Amino acid sequence: MNKIIYLTLLLSCFSSFAQITGKITDTNKKPLSFVSVYLDKSITGTTSNDSGNYELTIKKTGEYIIVFQFLGYKTVKKNISVKSFPYTLNVSLEDEEIRLDEFSIKTKENPANMIIRNAIDNKNNNTDKFKEYTSNFYSRGLFKVKNAPEKILGRSLGDLGGGLDTTRTGIIYLSETVSEITFQKRPRRFKEKILASKVSGSDNGISFNRAQEVNFDFYNNAVLIAENNLVSPIADEAFSFYTFKLEGSFYDKNAKLISKVKVTPKQVGGRVFSGYIYIVEDDWAIYGIDLFTNGKQVGIPIINELRFKQNYNYSAINNALIKISQTIDFKFGLFGFNVNGRFSAGYSNYNFKPNFTKQTFTKEVLAFTEGATKKDTDFWNQLRPVPLTKEELKDYKTKDSIKMVRESKPYLDSINKIQNKVNFLSPILGYTYQNSFKKWSLSFDGLIEDFSFNTVQGFHSSLGVSYFKRQNDKGKWWSAGLDVAYGLSDKKARPTFYYSRKWNNISKPRFYLSGGITTAQFNGRNPIKKLDNLIRSLTRRLNYIKIYEKEFVRIGYSEEIRNGVYFSSSLEYANRKPLFNTTNYSFARQSRNDPYTSNNPLEPDNFTSSVFTEHKIATLNVGATFIFGQNYLSYPDRKFNVSESKLPSLNVNYRKTFGADNSEFNADLITASLKQDVKAGNYGEFFYHFRGGMFLKNKNIAFMDNLQVKGNQMFVVTDDNRRNNFGLLEYYRFYTNNRYTEAHFEHNFNGYLLRKIPLINKLNFHLVTGIKGLFMWDKKPYYEYSIGMDNIGFGKWRVLRVDYVKSNFNGVKIDGFLFGLTF
């Protein structure tokens, strides 16, 4: 073992000096970043950093030909004789001479169209040349801010991890990742194993630099960016979205003719790119990418610009052009907080004949090797293919020092001392006392948190206290709390308590126990928000919410028992009591508005009797959710599930009510739901949701135990789950103790249709259409049809949606407009 360690150290020391180093500039002595540097006849090597410096590691002294390649500049080959290390080689690159040859000028057809058409026709042939491979991947992420504000919306930003200087300028995020990636074209699969990961100023070392997240393939018809599909310049339907112009051509190091084609969108604001694509003549493969887009086009308005650059190199092994480097530069800003960033990536050590087995690709698409986030500085100095700039090196050193200080007990205590100060708003807004070093906190819920109004309790709120203890950094914690709600009109206090525990972040097993006295909506799916009911009651005398009281104790447990299979269960014993209106208060005059209705959901004019009688009952729920095809990321001590499945998710639940005072209330119910978001490429996104239920025996059960749907009687919809709700259906009109099915379909075109209409396309609105249906065994079918506009707003503020909805029930048709916020 000692010999192995010694040999490893010896090789590491040798390799640290086996380097060719230097600086790359243009003819004006300006540093060139991300220039590809490699040995002739090889595919990959290294790249230069933002200062133009590079380090190329070779195994021994001797004669070498070093290639310097950068899009827009002439490729340079340097013959050198290396007799000792380190060897210094500085290089100056000249601008590429782009020229139009005579044939291109004389031809009647737009030569760029011919080039793009050939590139489209040869996509499959070119990508089949690297349909399977493994490679090494290195990435670096960098966020920089200039003149950052001290506060946003009244909240202090602090020093953002210690990266800001006195002008509040500096690096706020710096990370590096080294990994092995495995790729297969058919069926399309991708796998990554993290060998080393580092984040400046962080202990866990977990970065955002996933290879799959930046695997932007312009051979595909659609390039997925932030869950939005942008049309590739060589997509099958590219000519419907772009015009092309041949800027000129040049010869590469292999005497291949490279055409530089300008890409211009036909419609402004669509899911498109602008810039240049470089195509190799005869092969019709991509030689390089220099394309940009903006936040409006990718659906993230705060992004000002997003630029992609990709460099390719020829591989003689498979006679193909292979991506060897990529940069993604971006700018975004909000509330005066402006950030410039770059994610750079390099690919090396390609193997185009891997030996894949059935075990190669699983649902685990990312994993960390042991100790990947704990590598020390010496390790990174040996492994890092692209040298750090002076600014980056300083950031690592500064934040590592700051991190040690900020994890110490004196520092954490001093921060808590400031955070734990009580002010005059604490009773209203809430207050938390923290002990960060011992990892616990004590919180007080302010009066405003649960403040609301209904005609049973009147104005009501609650006071609560809770304790939270984090037991380790692997997701183990426990929490307990006590809450007392009080209504000013019914003058009744309702105390509740809870205890909850979680053991880890892998399967996320969670246990909870709760009990006390509370109020609940008759529809257990809670279709009415407290805030909505407060506003409508006080301004229009529309008291939609109907509630009952229950004294209860509940115990529950949930866990992901295997990947994509989530188990949940609960057992409750409750005494349910009817409640009645105790107040007629409203800001709205009764003479100008309809009077309040009773708390009886079926008889709005019955103020003296309820829809049910007081009773005791036990309720058992056992359910499972199946997310088919779920991929996941295995981070150290935690598992992240990826919601990118092309398959639907299924939820099945069994509910048994038993032990009731009235045996008719005892019943067995099975419910199931199936839903999916279907990405339709450039045509938008399609959503469907089916939900149904069936009682095993038809009985005269308590009203709140009936199958019910989520209706809506508000013209302003604040429910972010609107796709699963009906838009014009009265809250308590449809219920059953037998069986029912509901279906929801919605298609958001994401601008696909509207961007084809002149002037309208400048608004960047999204057309949305939908249809919903409800089918209950004892009622006629109910239907809703809708058409609307999403993404309404201006600039970076696009949070409004408007729908026109029309319903049809037994020949009776109702219509109306719904306004909603889509944060």
Regions picked out by a protein language model, each given a short descriptive name:
Residues 19-32:
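Structural motif
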Residues 39-41, 63, 67-77:
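A short, solvent-exposed loop/turn motif at the edges and junctions
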